[in-house]
Regions:
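A short, structured active-site edge motif that brings together acidic residues
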Residues: 104, 226-228, 290, 603, ...
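C-terminal accessory region of SF2 helicases/translocases
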Residues: 309, 335-344, 350-549
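Arginine/glycine-rich "motif VI" loop of SF2 helicases in the C-terminal RecA-like domain
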Residues: 348-355, 595, 624-625, 692-696
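Helicase motor core with emphasis on the C-terminal RecA-like subdomain
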Residues: 6-11, 16-20, 26, 30-59, ...
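Active-site-facing substrate-recognition patch
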Residues: 233, 509-601, 610-611, 615, ...
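PRPP-dependent phosphoribosyltransferase catalytic core
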Residues: 493, 508, 512-514, 685-708
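Activation segment
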Residues: 679-680
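Active-site signature of alpha/beta-hydrolase-fold catalytic machinery across serine-
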Residues: 61-62, 66, 201, 616, ...
């Protein structure tokens, strides 16, 4: 019998493809064998841009099998999401490919993975881009991997490009990895969502040579692009007046949608609230966000794949590469910020079925949310210079650095990654150091990217308004010159979805969105590094100085009261007394609080931005609850100096010893402490400490809004 290595390449590749899909009669899609041939025989660098469901994973698994039979080392597959890794490992196992992963959830398996790699018992190693940039991995494991690397695969390669809809700084480090590799090691990058600008940028990164050269002067990159039309998808847009109407539509028509699917939301709060509402009214759904426990996320993915739930209500945490070929529908409560991002998410549906339904329910709050995420991902010149100045030759951990620069942990980590890619800082064992390399803020570049983001947002609004074919619109957004009318969307074939909403569903949705009361966990420990800013505290906050669990009327991001609260706290909004409706909603929160002991008095926070609002709220709660109103705390020394959005250490330092309760006759009992907006919780923590020291046995914080 002829061995696979002795077969002509196409025959051997087709046999491997048959093993992968379980069908010996299978043949290649257009472009698949061309890519495999380039990798296995040509040992080239290739970029494959093909629609979801085309079979990009088949290319790299088949190429891996053939390269391994040639005696090559393992493939390293860079994959951005845990859900995607799990699906890729399952697909590899079905094909007889030995695949293992190193990620944040399986640290207990790392030693075994290293042993298997050393014993050449691994065909594919899946790693996240963040893991590739981990100092221990980079210094202890990566050199040996690069020395015997059989192939490098970069999945969801649009993440490399800062022009891409989901740019990730850690992906940009792949250019350095590619430059370290021998020129005859094949490299494959795959994506379904790249327009011409992103394709050019990614190809430049793939063509990197040692020393950083690339592009036209680097290694030639083969680009294989195919038509991106998804003929199985039936697209539509339904504009409804508010969040209650959108929830009511889902409640009325979720069971009419085919099979099981995904309901996407733009925020974590919206995902949690929507899932709770649908569950409360009999629908079998689960929430899935970046804040969901990893084990629960894996369980939810499995339940969706087995059709044990009608839907997962998810943020973009469930996105790239999630593999359920028969996914029946995708509904968006709120639009993504670009047609390209939308195409990527709806691409989860209908991969192995003749038809799947895709419906967009846009919201009036979408643009506000887009703006927040767009600005949060852009580096700030002043912050970047502050970070570089704080670092030296000795490693500083992220928590310690947080105590030196007024930046919160998440944006600080993102900024460090950007500066790392730019060569200004470097992550090493023990923290971060400054490299000493000159760094200049590329204002022109970031202005161009910001302008592109705004243009993408306008393009998304055009998608919502277009009277032309929706699939063709998405294809044109991806620079696909094969775009043609699909004949299936609501504009081509007429409305395929019901537009009406049952009155009972509307009433139930309105009641759900009228739900009030969000728990506010008190701070239990002081932040690390407070002493660096002359705040003489560390460790746990003494029990006698802590606040109790508090309440907020709602989060600013909530689907219900969140809209009203966002208007109140919008930049430039005038201060005014609280409205009767808002006051009654607050009374409902207090009525359902269930505190261990009823408060005996009310104290207000001395708000500088909304004094009328806070004073009227405190007085109103005092009158309705028949509790004495003691007045407001006083500032000391001009009030807090910490800026909203700063990190814990600076927020604490900004309000430390600023509150004075000496002028108030604080009783020896629980006190209700009233504020307008809770953000970091440090303001209320320090204020509660002052009230406790003045004689209160407990402090119950209450605010209109909770940020986050």
């Amino acid at each position: 019998m002829t061995s696979p290595t002795a077969m002509p390449l196409r025959e051997a590749a087709r046999a491997a493809l048959g093993e992968l899909v379980g069908r010996p009669d299978v043949d290649f899609h257009d472009g698949q064998f061309e890519a495999i041939e380039a990798l296995v025989e040509g040992r080239r660098r290739a970029l494959v841009v093909q629609r979801t469901g085309w079979g990009k994973s088949a290319v790299y698994f088949v190429a891996t099998l053939l390269r391994r039979r040639q005696g090559a080392g393992p493939t390293v597959l860079v994959s951005p999401l845990l859900a995607l890794m799990r699906d890729q490992i399952a697909a590899a196992e079905r094909a007889g490919v030995r695949a293992v992963a190193i990620n944040s959830t399986n640290a207990h398996e790392w030693a075994e993975v290293q042993e298997r790699l050393a014993g050449d018992d691994v065909d594919v190693l899946l790693v996240s881009p963040e893991r590739l940039n981990n100092p221990a991995f980079r210094e202890e494991q990566l050199p040996a991997l690069v020395a015997r690397l059989g192939m490098l695969v970069v999945d969801e390669a649009h993440c490399i490009s800062d022009w891409g809809h989901d740019f990730r700084p850690d992906y940009r480090r792949l250019r350095d990895l590619i430059a370290q590799m021998p020129a005859d090691v094949p490299v494959l990058a795959t994506t379904a969502t790249a327009n011409s600008r992103v394709v050019a940028d990614v190809a430049e990164q793939l063509g990197a040579l040692p020393g950083g050269a690339g592009g036209a002067e680097g290694v030639p990159v083969l680009t294989i692009r195919g038509p991106l039309a998804r003929t199985s998808l039936r697209l539509g847009v339904l504009r409804l007046k508010d969040s209650a109407s959108r929830l009511a539509w889902l409640l009325s028509h979720l069971d009419d949608l085919p099979g099981s699917g995904i309901i996407y939301t733009l925020t974590v709060a919206a995902a949690v609230d929507t899932a709770r509402f649908l569950r409360d009214h009999g629908h079998d759904v689960r929430a899935y966000t970046g804040q969901t426990d990893p084990e629960e996320r894996a369980e939810s993915e499995g339940m969706l794949k087995r059709n044990e739930v009608k839907a997962l209500v998810a943020t973009s945490a469930l996105g790239m590469g999630f593999d359920k070929p028969d996914l029946g529908f995708v509904v968006h409560l709120g639009a993504p910020s670009s047609p390209v991002a939308y195409y990527q998410q709806v691409g989860r549906a209908g991969r192995a079925s003749e038809s799947a339904d895709v419906l967009l329910l846009p919201g009036v709050e979408d643009r506000e949310i887009w703006h927040y995420f767009a600005t949060a991902s852009m580096p700030d010149r002043e912050r970047a210079e502050r970070v570089i100045a704080a670092l030296g030759d000795s490693p500083i951990s992220t928590p310690a650095l947080e105590a030196l620069v007024d930046i919160r942990r998440t944006p600080l980590e993102l900024l460090l990654k950007v500066l790392d890619v730019d060569g200004a800082v470097r992550r090493v064992q023990g923290g971060w150091i400054a490299t000493g390399h000159p760094w200049t803020y590329d204002a022109e570049r970031y202005e161009r990217i910001a302008a592109e983001r705004v243009a993408e947002q306008e393009h998304m609004l055009e998608y919502e308004r277009t009277d032309g074919c929706r699939m063709a619109f998405l294809q044109r957004a991806l620079d696909d010159d094969t775009a043609a009318p699909c004949g299936r969307c609501d504009n081509c074939a007429g409305l395929w979805f019901p537009a009406e909403v049952a009155q009972t569903a509307s009433a139930q949705a309105a009641a759900s969105l009228d739900r009030v009361g969000v728990p506010v966990e008190p701070r239990r420990a002081w932040p690390t590094g407070a002493d660096r800013l002359d705040v003489p505290v560390r460790g746990r906050i003494p029990a006698g100085e802590q606040a109790d669990e508090g309440r907020a009327l709602a989060r600013l991001t909530d689907l219900g009261w969140g809209g009203t609260l966002r208007e109140i706290f919008a930049a430039g909004a005038p201060d005014a007394p609280i409205s009767p409706a808002l006051l009654q909603a607050c009374v409902r929160v207090l009525a359902g609080w269930g505190w261990a002991e009823r408060p005996v008095a009310v104290i207000a926070m001395p708000s500088r931005s909304h004094p009328q609002l806070v004073d009227s709220l405190a007085r109103g709660l005092s009158e309705i609850g028949r509790l004495p109103y003691l007045g407001a705390l006083e500032w000391r020394g001009g009030g807090p100096s910490g800026q909203a959005g700063g990190n814990s250490v600076f927020r604490l330092a900004g309000v430390w010893n600023r509150f004075d309760a000496a002028h108030l006759e604080v009783p020896a009992g629980p006190v209700l402490l009233v504020d307008d907006l809770i953000d970091s919780r440090w303001t209320l923590t320090v204020a509660a400490r002052a009230v406790r020291q003045a004689g209160a046995t407990a402090v119950l914080p209450f605010a209109l809004a909770l940020r986050g």
